[in-house]
Every structure is written in structure tokens, then in C-alpha cells.
């Protein structure tokens, strides 16, 4: 049985991201796997290649030119065999992992020229959900402290439109729960920390490091605006951010998709800080400005605008939520955060946005009818409880959402399909059953071509 955020059994809509790190096998991000319409790096799983035979790999045993041609194919094949990937980094304490990655990046990066040591941190994210959390915020604070104390040639600054004009170096990082095989599946046992430094003046990746932290020492509670966000979908801007860290190596060009959205990212960072501090009018202005910036049409911008309007008690919140739904349908995947009573198919009333659930359902139903969409409604749960119980509960909750949508728009009858997958498609997978893995307890709506 699942529990919700704040000890409730919650079914929530959400989404996630794919990660692969230097020194680790590449992995497929759930968003990429289930979202063919959204471009993302092609995933692959690396396997260790068999070691070459000594006769083919050492000068002493290499065949002479006059040797029989029968040995040449084997020799050529051995020479073409790629080396086995290095072992994963050891698991260590949270602070030690952050220090290890930070020291490696700043030590290995080419020294900055005089008066050119500015480095900005593009806020780190969870490598699956794309959310910022207490853990990622703590990492940023630790990086800032370490650089100030030990790398005086650098000056860490906040990411802002003004600072970006100076073409500084930029830090990008992901913090991802993984299992014993370093994969984002099954029981998560540690957090994998990827940290990359890019040089905006050259457009190149100049340093990278990977470390692992013990899962028990990590606080993955989402930051305020992410904790409150009602909707998740596969977002190209966040996928580009994650790929910049996970799918890169030193010397690579920084991905253009990431660079195109940097101005919007700076505005979103400032807006998130304002929201966290309760400055909702300023947050609304910044999110609205970000929406008009290049590559500014992002889920976190739409979420931020909606939440700021809710906090300001403005009537425009209904239109803002409709924009969220439209964005999700255009991405072909919409996850909405509904909190249910423990073991029940009825909504809980403790969530501060629960009073808006009726409006959410009305807008989702209206958009589906307007777009003449058929919908697949899929319930999800965290891994807590038996598989059979989770499968049944996730289906019942999907069917409840289905019935509510059809009540609001009778035209949706015979155009929706309900399904439950239990915990088989977890995004976070930590099993904490709190706000940090709320995305695993989601109800997901996806437009489908053929009606049931």
C-alpha cells in the first residue's frame, strides 16, 4: 500500500529523465523510453567487452608479417575490441562525495585567465525527475564554500542574465538514485553525482567528475516550487540539461539545446528563489518574462506561473492551468499530482492544492474534448506493499479519474482507457513514501491515436 506526501497514500502525476555518466553504463531515462515524440539522446547499455588474448595484445606475441592469414581476422577483431568500462566510483558519505567531485572538476579544468574566473552554477537537478531538492541545494552551497576556500582563482556567482553576458564557466550537475548495478531501476542503494564544467566562451566541456553518495545521508525533498507543482511531463529543456552532464565527455561541444535555453534558465532560477522566499508577485513577473525568452516554453515556467497566481489568489490561475494541460498534451504525456487517502480511491483534503482538483479535472476534460483526443489513463504506485495490491490500487485510482473526467465531459465516454501498472514504472524508486517520491504515485494521462 502506498503513502502520500506527508504520510498519505498518494497517486500523483509526474515524469522523469534519463541519465548516463562517465565511468558508468549508460541508462535509458523513463521519459525518453515512454515519450517517442520528445527528442532525447539515444540510450544504450554498455557491457564489458572480453579481454583480448595475450597473443593479440602484446608486441612479443604479435604474429610476424609472414604468418598465416588465418590468424589475421582474429588479430583484427581483438584490436578492434573496446576496453572494458572502468569500475563505478565507491560509495561514500554525502559530504565526501560532493567534495570529491568538486575537487576533481576544479583541479582538472584548465586554469582560468586573469580576471576570468567567474563560474556560475545552473541549479543542479535530480537526474530522473528534473526537480531541484534540498540535496541539490546543499550540494550547491558546499561547492560554493569549497571553491571559496580552496580555489581562489574562481569566483562562484549566481546564474543571471547579466552574468551570462560575460561568457563565464558554468557548472551543471545531476544527482540520481541508482541500484547496486548503477541503474535507475529496482531498489535504489546510492545516489550518483555527476558534475560538469563548461566554458561558455569556447562552447566546450572542460571538466567532468562522477561520485556516489550513501542514500541514507541524502534529503531528496523537492524545493518549494517543485514540491507544489501540479503537473509533470517530459520536458525537452530539462532533458537537454541532464544530457549535458550525463551524456558528455571532456572536449565535447556543449549541447546547443542547452545553450539555447540558458537565458530562460537564468530567469527560472531567479523566479524559483523568489517563490521560495514568498515573493510571489516577483516570481510571477520572472516566470512571465522567461516564457517570452528563447526556449522559454518549458514545463517549469508554466508550473511556476500557475503556482504564483494561486498564491496571489488571481483568477488567471484557471487559464494558467489550462496552458499547463495544453503543454502536456502537446508533449504527448501529462502527469497530474492527485493526492489520495491511504488505501482509497478518494481524494485527500490535506494537500494545499486539493481544493483545485475539481478545476483541474474540468480543464483536462475540456482540453481532451477540444482536441478530440482519446486518453489512456494510467495509475502508478510506489513499491511499498505487495505487487498485487499495488496493481489493483493503481487501476482503481485510474478508473476513478476516468469516471470524474467522463462526468465533466460526457463526450469522453468510450474515448478513455484506464490501466494500472503498480510500481513497475517508478521514476524515483526510493520507496520513501513522502514528498520526495511523489512522482511514483501518479496518475498519468496520455493522448492515444486509437480510441478503446
How would you name each of these model-derived features?
Residues 21-71, 79-115, 199-292, 297:
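C-terminal/domain-edge helix-coil "capping" segments
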Residues 94-113, 345-378, 406-407, 445-452:
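Periplasmic peptidoglycan-binding/anchoring modules of Gram-negative envelope and division proteins
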Residues 82-96, 329-363, 382-388:
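Short, solvent-exposed beta-strand/turn patches at coil↔beta or beta↔helix junctions
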Residues 104-105, 118-124, 149, 154-198, ...:
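A short, hydrophobic beta-strand-centered structural micro-motif
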Residues 271, 305-306:
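Conserved small-residue packing positions in alpha-helical repeats and bundles
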Residues 283, 317-318:
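Single-residue signature of alpha-solenoid repeat helices
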Residues 288, 322-323:
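Alpha-solenoid helical repeat scaffolds
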Residues 130-137, 143-145, 350-352, 380-452:
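Periplasmic OmpA-like peptidoglycan-binding domain that tethers envelope proteins to the cell wall
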Amino acid at each position: 500500500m502506498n503513502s502520500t506526501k506527508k504520510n498519505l497514500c498518494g497517486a500523483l502525476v509526474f515524469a522523469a529523465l534519463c541519465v548516463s555518466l562517465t565511468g558508468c553504463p549508460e541508462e535509458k531515462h523513463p521519459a525518453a523510453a515512454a515519450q517517442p515524440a520528445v527528442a532525447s539522446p539515444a540510450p544504450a547499455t554498455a557491457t564489458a567487452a572480453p579481454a583480448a588474448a595475450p597473443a593479440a595484445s602484446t608486441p612479443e606475441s604479435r604474429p610476424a608479417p609472414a604468418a598465416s592469414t588465418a590468424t589475421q581476422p582474429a588479430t583484427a577483431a581483438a584490436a578492434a575490441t573496446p576496453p572494458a568500462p572502468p569500475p563505478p566510483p565507491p560509495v561514500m558519505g554525502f559530504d565526501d562525495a560532493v567534495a570529491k567531485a568538486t575537487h576533481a572538476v576544479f583541479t582538472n579544468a584548465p586554469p582560468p585567465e586573469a580576471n576570468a574566473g567567474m563560474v556560475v552554477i545552473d541549479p543542479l537537478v535530480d537526474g530522473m525527475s528534473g526537480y531541484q531538492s534540498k540535496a541539490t541545494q546543499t550540494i550547491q552551497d558546499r561547492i560554493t564554500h569549497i571553491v571559496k576556500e580552496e580555489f581562489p582563482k574562481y569566483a562562484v556567482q549566481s546564474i543571471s542574465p547579466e552574468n551570462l553576458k560575460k561568457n563565464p564557466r558554468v557548472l551543471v550537475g545531476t544527482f540520481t538514485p541508482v541500484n547496486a548495478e548503477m541503474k535507475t531501476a529496482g531498489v535504489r542503494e546510492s545516489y550518483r553525482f555527476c558534475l560538469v564544467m563548461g566554458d561558455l566562451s569556447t562552447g566546450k566541456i572542460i571538466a567532468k567528475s562522477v561520485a556516489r553518495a550513501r542514500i541514507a545521508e541524502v534529503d531528496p525533498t523537492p524545493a518549494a516550487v517543485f514540491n507544489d507543482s501540479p503537473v509533470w511531463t517530459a520536458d525537452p529543456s530539462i532533458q537537454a540539461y541532464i544530457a549535458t552532464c550525463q551524456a558528455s565527455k571532456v572536449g565535447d561541444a556543449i549541447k546547443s539545446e542547452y545553450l539555447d535555453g540558458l537565458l530562460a534558465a537564468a530567469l527560472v532560477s531567479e523566479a524559483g528563489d523568489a517563490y521560495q522566499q514568498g515573493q510571489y508577485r516577483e516570481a510571477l513577473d520572472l516566470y512571465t518574462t522567461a516564457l517570452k525568452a528563447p526556449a522559454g516554453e518549458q514545463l517549469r515556467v508554466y508550473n511556476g506561473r500557475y503556482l504564483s497566481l494561486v498564491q496571489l489568489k488571481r483568477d488567471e490561475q484557471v487559464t494558467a492551468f489550462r496552458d499547463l494541460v495544453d503543454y502536456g498534451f502537446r508533449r504527448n504525456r501529462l502527469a497530474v499530482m492527485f493526492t489520495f487517502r491511504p488505501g482509497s480511491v478518494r481524494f485527500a483534503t490535506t494537500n494545499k492544492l486539493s481544493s483545485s482538483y475539481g478545476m483541474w479535472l474540468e480543464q483536462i476534460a475540456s482540453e481532451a474534448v477540444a482536441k478530440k483526443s482519446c486518453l489512456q489513463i494510467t495509475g502508478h504506485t510506489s513499491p511499498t506493499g505487495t505487487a498485487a495490491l499495488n496493481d489493483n490500487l493503481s487501476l482503481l485510482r485510474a478508473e476513478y479519474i476516468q469516471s470524474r473526467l467522463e462526468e465533466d465531459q460526457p463526450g469522453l465516454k468510450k474515448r478513455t482507457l484506464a490501466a494500472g501498472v503498480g510500481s513497475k514504472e517508478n521514476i524515483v524508486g526510493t520507496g520513501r513514501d513522502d514528498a520526495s517520491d511523489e512522482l511514483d504515485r501518479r496518475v498519468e494521462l496520455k493522448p492515444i491515436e486509437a480510441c478503446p
